Amino acid sequence: MLGLGTLARKIFGTPNDRKVKSVRSLVARINDLEPEFQALSDEGIKQKTAEFQRRVQEGGESLDDLLPEAFANCREGARRALGLRAFDVQLMGGIFLHQGNIAEMKTGEGKTLVATFPAYLNALAGKGVHVVTVNDYLAKRDAEWMGKVYAQLGLATGVVYPFQSDEEKKAAYAADITYATNNELGFDYLRDNMKASKEEMRQRGHFFAIVDEVDSILIDEARTPLIISGPSQDRSDLYTKVDKLIPELVEEHYKLDEKTRNVTFTEEGNEFLEKRLLETGLLPEGQSLYDPESTTIVHHVNQGLRAHKLFNRDQQYIVRDDEIMLIDEFTGRMMRGRRLSDGLHQAIEAKEGVSIQPENVTLASVTFQNYFRLYEKLGGMTGTAATEAEEFMEIYGLGVVEVPTNRPVARADEHDAVYRTAREKHDGIVASIKDAHERGQPILVGTTSIDKSEALSDLLKSAGIPHNVLNARQHEQEAQIVADAGKLGAVTIATNMAGRGTDIQLGGNVEMKVMQALAADPAAHPDEVRARIEAEHAEEKERVKEAGGLFVLGTERHESRRIDNQLRGRSGRQGDPGRSAFFLSLEDDLMRIFGSDRLDKVLSTLGMKEGEAIVHPWVNKSLEKAQAKVEARNFDIRKQLLKFDDVMNDQRKAIFSQRLEIMETEDLSEIAQDMRYQVIDDLIDQHMPPRSYADQWDIEGMHRAVQDKLGLDAPLAKWAQEEGVDQDVVRERLCEASDRQMTEKAEAFGPETMRSIEKQILLQTIDAKWREHLLTLEHLRSVVGFRGYAQRDPLSEYKTEAFALFESMLNSLRQDVTQKLAQVRPLSEEEQQAMMRQFLDQQRAAAAAEAPVAPAPQPAAAAPQPTPELVGAEAGEPDPAAWGNVARNDPCPCGSGLKYKHCHGRLD
């Protein structure tokens, strides 16, 4: 008998069915327009793009109204540029992306081509579209490949990757459609908000982003903040000394919680540690671990414990070229340039005996959650999103739509096989691989870590089974290994295949084979080579199909069902046959941590023999329940982290917005004046409290403060003795005196130079104060959780204190800006010449030693500038004739620190 829910779905359809049905009329309209666009010339297609741009940008037509025509034009452009005609389901995927949804499309359904449709349509608005990929290789590959489509349509394509110059990045972001990784987009956003002028900024706004592998970026990476950091003090010696103590610990000294990935010292551990720290001199005599002075050493010891007990070589990281390289637990890739914060990376470096890099201080940070919420519209693609649909909707406002496959999935998904021990499981895996290999069926074996992939590789070597291994160590050969994975009888062991970005094609990859053949014989005719290889490939593909297609064998369940589904999804692409199965044991991490005791009792009751496996739907359901619990817990953690980060995000947006306003404003004298007046108000409130008499005022303290903050020697004692002088009179006189002082400075510097100085000082001070504030918030966040023990809500406490700290930072900012502007003064000609001589001496000494040239000393009035290039100038009077052509916005070669146009290049 059918349940009520099942019956309702059969009658009314699922919500997903209704969404798919709702766009069928649009797809039909696009199909109806196809002959019209096929009749256009190549130039006619480009002219259509120009027409669409006018209709949107000048005529005010909506993108939704333009969608059928734009998609029809894009489909024809792709057909001519790539020889690919988009299927109806690909058009559906494109429509859902344009509508701001996540399109769940199975592997091999052509997601890369799907992205071109909404990217083209939204690029017509002229605000730029970002297509986001998970790594630089895919960004470059997709930009080059799909760039042919956009070029056919008359649009420009850009690609952003690390180590480009500012000009290259600006050009890439100025293109109609820009391909980039999530990391580089986030870092460029932070870098832009550290620039000194708007002209230097690279990004031009956040209009529409299409995120490939959206679940990997917006969920798996959501807890990882992007941090731009600078070096702080070097404490590598302390890490090394602490690391020597950790191996002395025994199990009674610490408590390890694998579920939450946390480790803490027990009371016995603290006592042992205190004793050893005193013996080694790391803790001064008479001081205990619980004293406030011991905070630093306790922090180092805790990080050392985490490095040893939570981070394992070849699982969470590998050692390469005297460096610790982190490994992405979801994709198995190395994360170059990524470091753990708070001294944990240094603790791992000490553990492995590699060079310890200095700790860093945060200069700017943002999480992916908050970065991608900057976009006016967001869309995403993935093969697996349904299990996280609630999180996508709650945090990002993104609906998930499962797009039908072009052909029905023919893959057979088998129930999990569960063994008692890991040894029995491995025997079963090797036997299964051997059987499939002998039948010619290609096999992809998924493992969860490098060490497990290499252990399985050793077992296959012993069994005499040829195979390839794909993990972070072999990432350079990734494309070749994946291309070969679908060949007859191929055996490929891979760490998590999520986000690999390359389809495993039955019979191997034709394009890769053609490239290799042409590289081996450059004289061969490309068309003949392709025809021969395509014929061979078709024959091999049929043999692979007869053998059962690609067999995906998972050796362990991941905490996330989504990662397991991604592994399964590598098989059965475009209606190909395939098979998937997971071989598990009660010793696997997920089974061990999340309650294998009950299952162990069941297996014992059944009286299973050595080497036998239990295969039953009940086992699958139990595992999926355990995975769902882990996913729910991780979702709660991400939600809670987002609530905390939202507090900082509001402050970040306020600071970045203020910074942008300062960069865009030519004359900041009013802002500087408002700050000055506020500082005067604060000083009066502090030293001359309201409703107090003159004889109660702190005249001496006020005089010192006015000299320090305003640079004024005001006769406050004399004013206080005058009849009728109150706080308002003092305020008015100080404001007038400070205004006169700033007017005189502007005359001495010249108005244009003074405005430039005000801007530089404001931006430099904001950046410095924001850096300090980030550090303070980090410390607050690390301790505010303890307020829960006092029955106080940590989040409410964090919000209250973070707001108070923000106000305090703004107050400090006003004081520092006012003080710096009060102290700034023009350099005399003698001082400029002295600085010039000093710089030339340094340059000659550096040239003689073949060492880098030290930067020129900077006057107090100027921001640090790049080292000026001097051509043939001698010590003494600067000789402009010897400087060659100097750009007007470059630093003046005389060493004044001013721009050339404001100094020796002035047109007066």
From Swiss-Prot:
Zn(2+) binds at C892, C894, C903, H904. May bind 1 zinc ion per subunit. Keywords: ATP-binding, Cell inner membrane, Cell membrane, Cytoplasm, Membrane, Metal-binding, Nucleotide-binding, Protein transport, Translocase, Translocation, Transport, Zinc. GO terms for cellular component: cell envelope Sec protein transport complex; cytosol; plasma membrane. It is a peripheral membrane protein. GO terms for molecular function: ATP binding; metal ion binding; protein-exporting ATPase activity. SUPFAM superfamilies: Helical scaffold and wing domains of SecA, P-loop containing nucleoside triphosphate hydrolases, Pre-protein crosslinking domain of SecA. Pfam families: P-loop_SecA, SEC-C, SecA_DEAD, SecA_PP_bind, SecA_SW. ATP binds at Q90, G108, E109, G110, K111, T112, D503. Belongs to the SecA family. This is Protein translocase subunit SecA. It comes from Cereibacter sphaeroides (strain KD131 / KCTC 12085) (Rhodobacter sphaeroides). The lineage of its organism: Bacteria, Pseudomonadati, Pseudomonadota, Alphaproteobacteria, Rhodobacterales.
